[in-house]
């Protein structure tokens, strides 16, 4: 009887040791994967983008969150931001430039005080800025182009962040889906809001127009 109890103990001990080894392996793999990522800077895309057309110029408003991952005490200098958009067809994509940084403000219609609109105001020219863990940045950046060619479909895009500490940029890929109604809406005054969480329209994690 004592031998049977000892057998159960040994079996259980071996099983527990195996589980512990597996857990250690999982954590080791996770830590290795984390080590392969940039140890200092993290860039997170927002839930919302905004598009505006003014004649031949199309602007995309992006507000990423840029912060340092660990409390290293280091200061990161962001030296440049770039936006690339690849159209649904095989043609060349529009060439965007970082026009400026803006801020969103709420305004009331003087003829109807209960009507509130949201518009942007100039905040600053494009320029390098510093990021620390204590002070993450969420700039509203306006990227503009005069080469936008209207075409319905999925646009694959990349936001690139360049830094002073390394030549390796941080790139965040995302996608934007437009149909014919979206293209028509973009030609109207004002801006259109695109979100990644629009009910029944967020397939693939892409941004869809929120109407």
Stretches with model-predicted labels:
Residues 134-139, 151-161:
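A short tyrosine-centered beta-strand micro-motif
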Residues 3-36:
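Membrane-embedded hydrophobic alpha-helical segments
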Residues 167-211:
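Acidic, serine/threonine- and proline-rich intrinsically disordered appendage/tail regions
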Residues 32-58:
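Low-complexity, acidic Ser/Thr/Pro/Gly-rich terminal tails and inter-domain linkers that flank the onset
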Residues 72-82, 91-101:
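Short, hydrophobic/aromatic beta-strand segments
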Residues 99-146:
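Extended, solvent-exposed segments with strong compositional bias
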Residues 57-63, 154-156:
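Short, solvent-exposed loop/turn segments enriched in Ser/Thr/Gly
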Residues 49-59, 68-76, 130-132, 148-150:
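Short, solvent-exposed beta-strand/turn "edge" segments of beta-rich domains on protein surfaces
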């Amino acid at each position: 009887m004592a031998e049977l109890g000892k057998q159960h103990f040994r079996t259980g001990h071996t099983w527990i040791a195996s589980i512990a080894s597996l857990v250690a392996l999982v954590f080791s793999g996770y830590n290795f994967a984390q080590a392969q990522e940039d140890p200092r800077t993290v860039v997170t895309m927002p839930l919302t983008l905004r598009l505006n057309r003014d004649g031949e110029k199309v602007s995309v408003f992006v507000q990423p969150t840029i912060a340092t991952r660990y409390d290293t005490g280091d200061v990161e200098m962001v030296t440049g931001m770039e936006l690339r958009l690849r159209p649904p067809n095989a043609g060349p994509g529009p060439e965007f430039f970082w026009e400026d940084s803006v801020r969103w403000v709420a305004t009331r219609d003087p003829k109807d005080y209960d009507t509130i609109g949201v518009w942007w105001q100039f905040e600053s020219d494009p320029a390098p800025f510093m990021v620390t863990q204590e002070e993450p940045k969420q700039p509203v950046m306006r990227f503009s182009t005069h080469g936008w060619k209207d075409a319905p479909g999925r646009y694959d895009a990349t936001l690139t962040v360049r830094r002073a500490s390394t030549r390796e940029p941080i790139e965040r890929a995302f996608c934007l889906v437009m149909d014919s109604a979206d293209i028509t809406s973009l030609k109207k005054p004002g801006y259109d809001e695109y979100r990644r969480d629009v009910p029944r329209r967020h397939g693939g994690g892409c941004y869809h127009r929120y109407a």
